């Protein structure tokens, strides 16, 4: 993954100043670059990280002022004007959720991803580490304070933030499931965050499936206790449930299986019935957009996975959401998690 430093090494100082102030046409940027053959990819990666603004220009005729979204940086036009911004892209507040599947194993990837994406707050699941061994110092060096609720080798949740973390809660209000570190809540920038790692459930015949259903029932009560009607609230994390047919690669084969079972769907629907919105689906209705792929079957390479990681937001927060994506590039890196981050951008 690229970073701000990678991008800026391609740009002469005098051009960098223009990028921040007046913007630079892509053609001029390309001519001034020390290594123009690397520029397009660097622009794309830095744009994904949220610190480049691009205004479309058709042969010198500016289009309406707007930010250009594109999935392939090769479509940049010569007259497109590029701005390098000090603040987060469009001054938006960026929140992410990511099941890292062991924070100690994934720490180099996480630190690189934080530098590239520059999120304001991140909810992590499956940190798999006791609190004393949580890499708080390394994260602080990267600009993030953290609160964690962990245990040895299993489960574990944490919240990372560039802003003060307030009103931290470890576990459920009613002390349910105290032996498992699966829920942490806090307030950041006035937004109440509930970070949850719902049990996988194993098989529908097992006690672990009953535990999963009970856990979701308790989560519903926990959300009701938050009394969130007038202030922004996000429930973020690994839900281990694919809501609909478009969220799995083979819905027929998944029928009545764990993570795609009617009882799970009914409980998940109770959350949305409270007025919580699945933010990814607010912006992207396409099928085949997954956040988890099985290592054992090479699911990522085969395009076979499930969308089981969500940002659910109440009406107040949903109204401020400008975008929500699944960052599949993080899944393509060396030693990745089996999950990809889900990122939401908000105009608070």
Q: Regions from the language model: what does each represent?
A:
Residues 1-67, 75:
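Basic helix-extension-helix modules of the SAP/HeH family
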Residues 4, 16, 71-145, 152-157, ...:
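N-terminal, active-site-proximal structural segment of metallo-dependent hydrolase catalytic domains
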Residues 81, 131, 140, 168-175, ...:
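Metal-dependent phosphoester-hydrolase catalytic domains
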Residues 95-99, 114-132, 193, 223-245, ...:
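Active-site beta-strand/loop signature of hydrolases that rely on acidic residues for catalysis
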Residues 118, 143, 164, 275-276:
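Residue-level detector of structured alpha->beta connecting loops
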Residues 127-130, 134-203:
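Structured beta-strand-rich core segments of catalytic domains in phosphoester-bond hydrolases
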Residues 173-174, 199-216, 252-257:
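Surface-exposed cleft-lining segments at the edges of enzyme active sites
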Residues 209-230:
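A long, amphipathic alpha-helix that forms part
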């Amino acid at each position: 993954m690229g970073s701000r430093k990678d991008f800026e090494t391609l740009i002469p100082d005098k051009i960098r100043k223009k990028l921040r102030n007046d913007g630079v046409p892509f053609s001029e940027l390309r001519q001034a670059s020390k290594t123009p053959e690397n520029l397009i990819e660097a622009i794309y990666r830095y744009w994904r990280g949220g610190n480049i603004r691009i205004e479309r220009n058709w042969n010198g005729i500016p289009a309406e002022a707007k930010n250009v979204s594109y999935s392939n940086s090769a479509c940049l036009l010569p007259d497109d004007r590029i701005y390098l911004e000090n603040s987060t892209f469009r001054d938006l507040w960026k929140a992410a959720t990511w099941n890292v599947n062991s924070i100690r194993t994934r720490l180099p990837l996480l630190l690189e991803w934080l530098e590239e994406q520059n999120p304001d707050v991140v909810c992590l699941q499956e940190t798999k580490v006791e609190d004393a061994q949580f890499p708080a110092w390394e994260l602080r060096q990267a600009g993030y304070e953290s609160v964690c609720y962990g245990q040895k080798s299993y489960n574990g949740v944490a919240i990372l933030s560039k802003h003060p973390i307030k009103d931290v809660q470890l576990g459920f209000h009613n002390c349910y499931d105290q032996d498992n570190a699966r829920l942490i809540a806090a307030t950041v920038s006035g937004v109440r965050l509930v970070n949850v790692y719902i049990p996988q459930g194993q098989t529908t015949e097992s006690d672990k499936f009953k535990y999963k259903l009970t856990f979701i029932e308790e989560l519903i009560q926990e959300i009701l206790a938050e009394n969130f009607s007038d202030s922004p609230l996000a429930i973020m994390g690994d839900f281990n449930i694919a809501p609909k047919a478009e969220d799995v690669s083979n819905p027929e084969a998944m029928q009545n299986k764990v993570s795609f079972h009617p009882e799970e769907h009914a409980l998940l629907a109770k959350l949305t019935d409270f007025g919580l919105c699945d933010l990814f689906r607010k912006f992207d209705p396409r099928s085949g957009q997954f956040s988890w792929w099985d290592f054992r079957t090479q699911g990522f390479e085969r395009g076979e996975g499930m969308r089981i990681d969500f940002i659910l937001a109440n009406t107040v927060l949903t109204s401020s959401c400008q975008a929500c994506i699944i960052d599949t590039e993080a899944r393509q890196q060396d030693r990745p998690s089996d999950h990809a981050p889900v990122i939401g951008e908000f105009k608070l």
